[in-house]
Amino acid sequence: MRNMKIITCLLTITSLVFTACGRGSNDIEKAKSVATTEHLKRYTEAISHDSCQGRKPFSEGAERAVNYIARQMKEVGLKPIDGDSYFQQVNIISSRTRCPDPMVLKTPKGKIPLDWLEGYTAFSARIEPEIDIDNAELVFAGYGIVAPEYGKNDFEGIENPRDKVAVVIVNDPGLGSDNTDYFNGDIMTYYGRWMYKFEEGARQGLKGVLIIHEDRGAGYPWSVVRASAQSKMYVDSDSDAYHCPLNGWIQFNAAKQLLADNGYDIDQLIEQSKSPDFKPISLK
């Protein structure tokens, strides 16, 4: 475990607003003078520069980035949050998940072996030495969404979720639609993001979530998923509270075979999953 200095853009903006409001007009005018389009452009260019190395935790680039942000805070007159410091300490753990190669899915028609990085990727953000998913039951849970404003709950009716791994579709039900009143149409909402699906799986108490990858729905090719799976993961020391034991992705064709072996057509299920009336389907 290591301590890491972090500062977020949200903190910068929030501090600017509340500090400015609580001080004199000169301070407000100073804040206005630096909060310009040109200043934000320079700021964005600076922290996205190659020298910051993607702001990867514990890297020299991340150190450059946070020190730059701290200087910017000082220049615009923001108050430090801890004595004379603009930094806070956060406990961060780096980990790497070793997965079975292949992972085998059991179906009514036999077994489907999925090669690591080619057929699937998986990781665990839990601070545990081993995650056991042997004999976990797979459930097709549509888009993996709980959205009361659209009358949609793709997990409704799942029993004993701690023993289940949900297989869900990337993106949201608005994909390919012109109806902006339903999940914002073809513009992805947060419900369509992979992070949301993993978060919702944890809220539902599931053992795991596997997202069906499809280039158009994800917005990027499988190579991005594969590259990410080979990198170290950085999580905070309380990550067990809001992560499933297992999260991952499977290739579209692998999911297609899995569903076909259970008597379902993947394209038909994708269409059915767009409806608020969709209910999860147990896979044997």
Pin down the residues of each PLM region.
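Noncatalytic luminal/extracellular "stalk/propeptide" segments of secretory-pathway proteins
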Residues: 53-176
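Bacterial lipoprotein signal-peptidase II cleavage site
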Residues: 22-27
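Soluble non-cytosolic domains of exported or imported proteins
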Residues: 34-41, 56-67, 81, 133, ...
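Soluble metallo-hydrolase cores and metallopeptidase-like ectodomains found primarily
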Residues: 28, 106-109, 120-158, 239-284
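Bacterial N-terminal signal peptides that target proteins for export
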Residues: 1-9
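C-terminal motif of bacterial Sec signal peptides marking the signal peptidase cleavage site
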Residues: 17-20
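A conserved hydrophobic secondary-structure block that centers on an alpha-helix together
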Residues: 139-223
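N-terminal capping segment at the start of a domain
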Residues: 29, 34-60, 76, 82, ...
